[in-house]
Amino acid sequence: MSDFSASDPNQPPPVAGQGGSPPPPPPPNLSPPPGYQAYSAAPTPVSGSLSRVSGLSKAVVILAAVAAVGSVVTAITTPGAVDSARQFRDGAISESRFLDDYTAYGLTQTLQGIGTLATAVLTIIWLYRIAKNVRVMGRATTWAPIWAVFGWILPPVLIIIPFLMVREMWKASNPDVGLGAEQWKQGDENPLIIVWFVLYGIVPAILTVISSSNALSAGFEQDAEDVARVLDESGSVTILGSIVSAVAAVVWILVVRQLTARHVAFTNER
C-alpha cells in the first residue's frame, strides 16, 4: 500500500522514478514542430509586404516647407509685437491696442504650430514605413518600427531617439550592401542628420528652458501687463528660435529627400 493517503493532504504524491517504475524514454527522431524558430537575441525581421514611401515623402517636404515659411513669418513679425509690448508698458498705447497687436502675432504662431504638427504626423508615418521596410528586407535593426511613433511623443529629454532612429534607417537603407549582410551597420554617416538633430533638438531645448523661466515667473494667470513683460523680455529668444526652426525645417527637407532616395534604391520601389 502506498504511503500517500488522501486523508493526509500535506503529503506530496509519489514522483515517477522514486519507488515506482522509471518514466518512459522520449521517442526517437524528435523534430521541432512546423514553424518553430530557436530563440535569437537579434531583432526578429518583420514579415509582410513593402510600403511605398516616395509619395509620402513629398507631402512631408511640402508641409516642412510650410512650417519653415511660418517660422520666417514669426521671426519677421516678432519685433513689431515686442515694440507694441514695450509701448504698452510705457503707457504709449492702450491695453486694447496691445491685445489687438498680440492677437495678430499669436495667429502667425498658431499657423506655424499647425504646419509643424502636420509635418510631425506625416513624418511619423513615413519613418514607420521605412523602419518596417528595412526589417521586411531582413535588416536586424535596433529600433523597431513602433519607435517611429513613441520616439516623438515621449518626454522631450528623449528627443535623441528620433535622431538615433533616423541615423540607423540611413544605414539600414544602404543599397550597396546585399541582403543578409551586416556591413550596413558600419556604413557611412549622413552629416545632415547630425546637423538636423542639433537644430531641431539641442538648440530648441536650450531656448525653451530660457523662455520658460520668463513665462513661469509671470505665473499661470497672466494679465495684459504680464503678457507684455514676457514678450518684451523673451522677444530675442523667440526670434532666434524661429530662425533656428526655419533652418531646421530646411535641413529636414534635405534629410527626407536623401533618405527617401536611398531607401527607394534599396527596396527597388517603383
State what each model feature region is.
Residues 101-118, 202, 232-248:
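Hydrophobic alpha-helical transmembrane segments
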Residues 1-48:
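Intrinsically disordered, low-complexity Pro/Gly-rich regions
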Residues 209-246:
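Extracellular/periplasmic helix-loop-helix junctions in multi-pass membrane proteins
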Residues 29-72, 80-99, 122-150, 160-201, ...:
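Membrane-interface extramembranous regions at the lipid-water interface
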Residues 201-208:
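Aromatic-anchored segments of alpha-helical transmembrane domains
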Residues 21-24, 39, 110, 205, ...:
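Intrinsically disordered, low-complexity, compositionally biased regions/tails
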Residues 153-156:
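All-alpha RGS (Regulator of G-protein Signaling) helical domain and cognate RGS-like helical scaffolds
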